[in-house]
Amino acid sequence: MTRGEKVCAFIKAYCKIPAGAHVGQPIKLMKFQKQFILDVYDNPHGTSRAYLSVARKNGKSALIAAVVLAHLVGPEAKQNSQIISGARSRDQASLVFKLAEKMIRLSPELSKIVRIVPSQKMLIGLICNVEYKAISAESGTAHGLSPSLAILDEIGQVRGPHDAFIEAIETAQSVKVQAAAKIKKPLN
């Protein structure tokens, strides 16, 4: 199996639909979601940056939450690594965290190997001691990080050519030698 196929298999086996009419059922990746994962993880030249831009209500945030879980306790988990998702506002930053938290609570297997720290918007993968945290530009916590995976949400809200928050995250991640992916979700 390729890296991308392993991520897809992990999502299929362990991630449940976190909300809506089909809550609790296994996630079935849509064709574009599966292709996005395969393109990111199976690129023979490596992927340092990936953009996912689709219309609202097409499962972007749920897909990103599932990818976070694949890096937290799945096939992409790396010992003592750090994952972050960030957005301009606290509310938007917490969206991926909330979806991942729901997926964990819906999965007996994931519930046993992930510690949820709601007050800090943090998840800890107990197998490899991987830490995920949702951060916002409002909190000013982007400096001093060294993530192996950084997810930036709604970058379409950035006005002008420079954004200190995004730059801090991109700079922190660029020091990683083998960063898996930087996934950005433009505003739609």
Segments (PLM) and residue ranges:
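Phosphate/NTP-binding elements of NTP-utilizing enzymes
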Residues: M1-N188
